[in-house]
Regions:
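Alpha-helical membrane-inserting segments
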Residues: 29-33, 37, 51, 55, ...
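Interfacial helix-loop-helix linkers and transmembrane-helix boundary segments
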Residues: 37-43, 61-71, 86-104, 244-247, ...
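Transmembrane helix-loop junctions at the membrane interface of multipass transporters and ion channels
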Residues: 61-65, 89-90, 122-124, 142-165, ...
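Alpha-helical membrane segments and immediately flanking helix-loop junctions
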Residues: 119, 123-172, 340-385
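Entry/N-cap segments of selected transmembrane alpha helices
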Residues: 90-117, 171, 305-333, 382-384
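Structural signature of multi-pass alpha-helical membrane transport proteins
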Residues: 2-3, 10, 14-69, 77, ...
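Juxtamembrane and boundary regions of transmembrane helices in multi-pass small-molecule transporters
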Residues: 3-5, 9, 112-127, 166-211, ...
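Hydrophobic alpha-helical transmembrane segments
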Residues: 20-25, 46, 50, 74, ...
Length: 402
């Protein structure tokens, strides 16, 4: 930790200092690039990921243990904020269209698994390798961990490393692929954003916070309930759920806090413990943005070198990953739009939630008008079930390879 790894103009930085510096540079440059629009379209905060990959590919030495902690903590902050923002209206929205959206999520997962198996057979690829590409294409780190544990239990030589390589090569373009899927859905269905309903804006304006609520103190944010939610969420996410396979399924560090935050956001407002000024205040919004920025920077800085190395030897995995990423959500959301007539902002959130992909939700929130929570609702409605299914199917692909 005390070894000096990086210097600028005779200033030397330890690996910890280098890591923090690279995180700051990744976020700073990524946010600047995110303001660039081409024909009104921008990748937004997703640029942070690619700046991080670029810096890592240049050989900047970061502390990977530190990156892992920062990445996970950023993700926890992000999903906690999303859960609090969506919570007050989540269960009402779930009753309206939650069942249909979760069935869509189930179909989306099944299509992804089916395409993965077909590619493995047609391209003569090992299914264990494709399981790694699958987890990267759906941006699901817990699924990768579950698959690695499964191959470890089965004693498959070298499979864990190949799983990680497949994940690393598919993940970066998966983030872009899901955003492109959102744009293609808009193009296919000729959606005019100016005419797209944003019901949540009106409902929020008619549901103002009570002035004497405890949440109005200190700028509308109380840290105590937030960290209680995080603590309870981590406990919930660590509870093993037996499903009759080699390893139990867990909601993980993202799924657990999200579920607890949803309940806390709904129950807290309903019981009058705090108002929507707390759950949707500037403090929670900033928590969400800081969380996603830390997460993307951590992922990029940690994956850059592995991404470049794997692309050089397994470049077709990139193509396979893009197919697994984009085909299922495009087909499912076209059905959701053309048959079920679901809102476009909700469907963008659905794409992110059904792939457990926070950057897609960040993009959707950037596209949606200020005050519209439909992307958050679509994301949170399908995320818990999707997380379970993604972890389960990652292990299933490994077991199918035996």
């Amino acid at each position: 930790m005390d070894n000096y790894q990086f210097s600028i103009l005779n200033f030397q930085f330890s690996t910890v200092g280098t890591t923090v510096l690279m995180l700051a540079i990744s976020i700073f440059l990524g946010l600047l690039l995110g303001k660039i629009k081409i024909k009104g379209i921008t990748l937004g905060i997703t640029w942070v990921l690619f700046v991080g990959i670029g810096l890592s590919a240049l050989g900047v030495a970061c502390n990977h243990d530190m990156l892992h902690i920062i990445k996970e903590f950023g993700l926890i902050l992000f999903v906690t904020a999303v859960g609090l923002q969506v919570g007050p209206g989540f269960f009402r929205s779930f009753k309206k269209g939650g069942l249909a959206m979760n069935i869509m999520a189930l179909v989306n997962v099944a299509l992804g698994v089916g395409i993965t198996v077909i590619i493995a057979k047609m391209a003569n690829q090992e299914l264990t390798d494709m399981a790694g590409v699958y987890t990267g294409a759906i941006t699901n780190t817990p699924g990768l961990s579950a698959a690695q544990q499964a191959v470890g239990d089965l004693g498959i030589e070298g499979a864990s490393e190949r799983l990680a390589a497949g994940y690393a090569v598919a993940y970066p373009l998966a983030v872009v692929g899901m955003i492109v899927s959102c744009l293609l859905l808009r193009w296919f269905c000729r959606i005019d954003l100016k005419k797209e309903p944003t019901e949540e804006i009106q409902s929020n304006q008619n549901n103002q916070s009570t002035p004497n609520s405890t949440s109005s103190k200190k700028g509308g944010i109380l840290l105590i309930p937030i960290f209680i939610i995080i603590a309870l969420g981590i406990v919930l996410g660590s509870i093993p759920i037996p499903v009759g396979m080699k390893a139990p399924v867990k909601l993980g560090l993202a799924g657990g806090p999200l579920v607890v935050a949803l309940i806390a956001g709904w129950l807290g407002v309903k019981k009058g413990w705090y108002s929507t000024e707390f759950t949707d205040g500037q403090g929670v919004h900033m928590l969400r943005e800081v969380g996603i920025a830390l997460f993307l920077a951590g992922v990029g800085l940690g994956a850059g070198q592995a991404f470049v190395a794997t692309v050089q030897t397994h470049y077709m995995w990139v193509v396979y990953g893009v197919i697994i990423t984009m085909v299922p959500p495009i087909l499912v959301t076209l059905f959701g739009r053309l048959v079920l007539h679901l809102n476009y902002y909700t469907l963008m959130g659905f794409i992110g939630g059904s792939h457990t992909d926070p950057p897609t939700l960040a993009f959707a929130n950037n596209v949606a008008p200020e005050g519209c929570k439909l992307p958050n609702t679509g994301y949170a409605t399908v995320y818990p079930l999707t997380m379970f299914l993604r972890i389960f199917t990652a292990q299933l692909l490994v077991l199918m390879a035996i």
